[in-house]
Amino acid sequence: MFGKMEMDWQIEEFMLYCRTRQLRKKTMGSYEQTLRLFERWCREKLDIATVDRISENVIRRYIADLQERGKYSFYAEEQTKQKNHPDRRRDFRKPISVTTINNYLRNIRVLFNWLESEEVIRKNPMKKVRLLKHNRQAKEYLSDEEMRKLISRMDKSYFPEHRDYVMIVLMFDTGMRLGECSSLVMRDVDLSSRRIMLRAEITKGRKDRIVYFSAKTETILRRWLQFKDRYVDTDYLFPVKRSGNPVSVCNFECNFKKYLARSSLNPNVSPHCLRNNFAKRCLMNGIAWCFYLIRAFVSIYKSSSCSFCKLSQTPRG
């Protein structure tokens, strides 16, 4: 059963396997980017081109190299460097975070677990490799005052900022993820009952989920729909004005950083912080609502770990 060993070929086979499993494009993109980077590093740094020559020691050398070289100092393809000019980035060669390195290791582990299950390799080099340890930090969140400051500085006469304003309010009010919010279409939203159906194909857990929003958010959504329909004819709830396609996560994240800077707020706050805020408000809503909140929290937030609850209750200094 031990067949073709070239790493490049095996990555192609693995990606084909991922497509047959109907994994999300984002997941497959993460796998391929990580694996192509690792494949080129093995080939250029160690002259290794086959998966059977990858050992535990090779993996550990790769980890050490990641820790030493810094961000964007190695790339999967020459075209990537020529197109993106990583050396012009402000964070060029800054340390790669432990979280990022661990994500790389998880993706590499998935490949070698698959190779082992397919009997392409006899020994799995990732079997004894552990994720790097790092100190978990309390989740970032915005206070009510900071939230008001953030949205008050947004220009709602300008299409992109009006769209982003409504997205921020909606995520803050419902606890939905950015990727879920950006993928919404008109039929997902029921304004009369003030609820949104998050379809299985856009949720992280691949299960339908319903979230509810307030009367104030309903008013904001109705105004947005009137505004949007004057400029774009699309079924997407939060489109890009020119194309009518849904705003990308990357686009929104870049805009969000700009809004934080404009409001002189913590630059480390991310859009996911709005989801943290939602969970924190649920947890702090009073002991009398305990059973209701637990059911709502599990249903809406779908958190897989109670560790979030502990971290989100940590007061800010």
Name these PLM-found stretches.
Residues 155-159, 233, 253-294, 301, ...:
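Short, basic (Lys/Arg/His-rich) helix/loop patches that form interaction surfaces
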Residues 178-179, 183-223:
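Conserved tyrosine-mediated DNA breakage-rejoining catalytic core shared by Y-recombinases
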Residues 121, 134-149, 204-216, 231-235, ...:
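DNA breakage-rejoining catalytic core of tyrosine-based enzymes
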Residues 119, 170-183, 285-287, 296-299:
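A short, glycine-centered helix-capping/turn motif at helix boundaries
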Residues 12-29, 35-138, 153-157:
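N-terminal core-binding DNA-recognition domain of tyrosine recombinases/integrases
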Residues 214-266:
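Active-site/catalytic core of tyrosine-dependent DNA strand-transfer enzymes
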Residues 28, 108, 167-168, 175, ...:
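Alpha-helix N-cap/helix-start motif at helix boundaries, enriched for small hydrophobics
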Residues 121, 135-136, 149-178, 232:
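Basic, Lys/Arg- and aromatic-enriched nucleic-acid-binding interface segment
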